Amino acid sequence: NVEVYAMLAQLKRDKSKNPDMLTILCGCMMQEPEVIERIKKSYRNVDIIFGTHNIFKLAELLAMRLFDQDAKRMIIDIWKDTTEIVEELPNSRKYSFKGGVNIMFGCNNFCSYCIVPYVRGRERSREPEDIIEEMKGMVADGVVEVMLLGQNVNSYGKTLEHPISFAQLLRQVEQIEGLERIRFMTSHPKDLSDELIEVMSQSDKICKHLHLPLQSGS
């Protein structure tokens, strides 16, 4: 937090020299009410603040700030929680041959030293059809390696109307033609199943390692 406030102080000085500059804050830290109050009080140079649940609204908030004369003030749009997942968002990749795919959001574990359940909400899984469709599009663009992402991928699928296991999802992902390597993170040990171990042992595409969160030991 100290680094963020130091950066805001620097940006405040920069904005005094360039009044048209916009300062936008987002992410986990913005989900904390005391942080918002401090920014409102001490860093009025900030133009837009939003949290972890509505990143897809960036363009809308930016347009509001730029073109709405009634919005020439600090815009704060924080969602305390959500059950929604917005699909078909545009994305860009740093590398042409690999990319990450979110399969779920939030977490139901409350490990020591971890703020995720408080700021990103409870677990919400994407429908497998949406995941597969996104990955097929990536492969068509030349991607050969994917990283399946979630705070705890081992508990994927439990919140779906028609629940499936993470191992079952991996079997579907394996069937995508042109996809060569599959990685995933993060895997909470308490939800690691024998089915997942079996799928990994039988697969020629799934990389043979597990990414375990250190805080799960607490």
How should these model regions be labeled?
Residues N1-L149, N154-Y156, L210:
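Proteins enriched for Cys/Gly/acidic motifs involved in redox and nucleic-acid/cofactor modification
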Residues T23-G27, E32-E34, A140-S218:
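Conserved SAM/AdoMet-binding glycine-rich loop
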